[in-house]
Amino acid sequence: MPEIGVRNGAFGADKFGLQNLKAVYWNPGAPQLYEHALRSGEAMVNADGALCAETGIFTGRSPKDKFTVRDAATDKSVWWAGNQSMTPDQFAALYSDFLAHARNMTLFAQDLYGGADPNFRIKTRVFTELAWHSLFIRTLLRRPETSELAAFVPELTVIDLPSFRADPQRHGVRSENVVAIDFTRRIILIGGSHYAGEMKKSIFTTLNYYLPDQDVLPMHCSANVGPGGDSAIFFGLSGTGKTTLSADPGRTLIGDDEHGWSKDGIFNFEGGCYAKCIRLSREAEPEIYAASKRFGAVLENVVHDEVTRVPDFNDGSKTENTRSAYPLEFIPNASLTGCAGQPKNLVMLAADAFGVLPPIARLTPAQAMYHFLSGYTAKVAGTERDLGNEPQPEFSACFGSPFLPRHPGVYGNMLRALIAKHNVDCWLVNTGWTGGKYGTGRRMPIKVTRALLGAALDGSLRGVPFHDDRYFGFAVPTSVPGVEPHILDPIRTWADKIEFDRTARALIGMFRQNFTKFENDVDAEVREAAPGTMMAAE
């Protein structure tokens, strides 16, 4: 079979059982992949030069269709309460059927790195059925120099075949769609879905499994670094402002989504960004807007004018989860090394729709571990389907529960130790509501959030007075230059103090109920960091 492109000839497609293929294109760049995608009709080019594709019925990840092989090695190491298992025999049958399905196909192969730090990166080979998927993953991971490809030996292999259909009875899965990960054999199989994000997040899941054994904490976070080399980490679930707040013109962006924290500092796992682009505008997010409107960007499910091919980022008729993938170098102030020193600040973002968390609070290491394991934000009507008028809490362990192969306590203990070792200042920032909950209060002004965050990152908050929040126990500043004092204490912003008390106590109960599953895995200091502990002692 023809194999075209620069590669390690000793580790070709046949090494992975991929035989009788029509052709394999090795490490093609964007121009070649555009040509293949257009020739096959799998994508189109818009008026800005971006490559645009639709993903059909799957416009997001399908976590219920993700499975991990349970064998002698993973039986004790994987967190089975949060991961679905399949047997080695079921995976073997699935792998065999993948290889059979690939016969007579043209595949695209990319040799890439998962991780910017040469000491901890994982050499990753990705075979894709679709050219636009190949461009996507080439954009999202880190690309080796051409001179490195001839000796590239993969440590992780991904086979991505959207046209494959799984057999639930034969393969032990839920539907025809499947993501199967074998940590022992270091293979990922993805079938049935055209949604390219499945590749990105399944590779992230494997990094979350392998890196703790090398004393590296994998994190679902964004990160940036100041002019003085002071790096900062931003945790937060969707809608909390993680991407927006880490994109600070006065600081260099390290990455927007996945990072590792090692003895040497922090590093990006990726070489690109995967931004939500629903209602994207030049005014609100100029850098992401510009990056999404040029050759080399990949747009998923973005609606275009049929004649002019001009994108309409405001149109969510296909999905609210429209996406733009682009190389990190498309962002003017991005770090191309993807590495920085030890962080000085760690920020946990929560869009508290109950309106009872302060706009900023300082956390002890034990409180930081508690809130890291909790991973709190809140959903409201208008941003999620099937929600009523009341906010709904969302707790996702380590701010990334779907991607945790190990018990959350593994990552929590690593975080706590790193915070203590490097004397990191930890902050909880509420980007949600103030003056009342969703429906009666107002969204926290972004100007206030930026001012408080700036004061935290530049060290200004170290010189201001703090008081202990009666409800949640963390330290809250009583005055910050440039910020109205009353907004710092949430109860002062509510007209109805009795309703504030009721709402705060209700949220405390939600935190405590969620944390019951971790109580036996943490020490007394972390348990006592729970919201409401001070009130109980009164």
Curated annotation (Swiss-Prot):
Its cofactor is Mn(2+). It comes from the Bacteria. Substrate binds at R61, Y195, K201, R323. GO terms for molecular function: ATP binding; metal ion binding; phosphoenolpyruvate carboxykinase (ATP) activity. ATP binds at K201, H220, G236, L237, S238, G239, T240, G241, K242, T243, T244, E285, R323, T449. The keyword Metal-binding applies. Binds 1 Mn(2+) ion per subunit. Its EC number is 4.1.1.49. It catalyses: oxaloacetate + ATP = phosphoenolpyruvate + ADP + CO2. Pathway: Carbohydrate biosynthesis; gluconeogenesis. GO terms for cellular component: cytosol. Keywords: ATP-binding, Cytoplasm, Decarboxylase, Gluconeogenesis, Lyase, Manganese, Metal-binding, Nucleotide-binding. It is an enzyme of class 4 (lyase). GO terms for biological process: gluconeogenesis. Mn(2+) binds at K201, H220, D257. Its main location: cytoplasm. Pfam families: PEPCK_ATP. It is found in: Cytoplasm. NCBIfam families: pckA (TIGR00224), PRK09344.1-2 (NF006820), PRK09344.1-3 (NF006821), PRK09344.1-4 (NF006822). Belongs to the phosphoenolpyruvate carboxykinase (ATP) family. Involved in the gluconeogenesis. Catalyzes the conversion of oxaloacetate (OAA) to phosphoenolpyruvate (PEP) through direct phosphoryl transfer between the nucleoside triphosphate and OAA. This is Phosphoenolpyruvate carboxykinase (ATP).
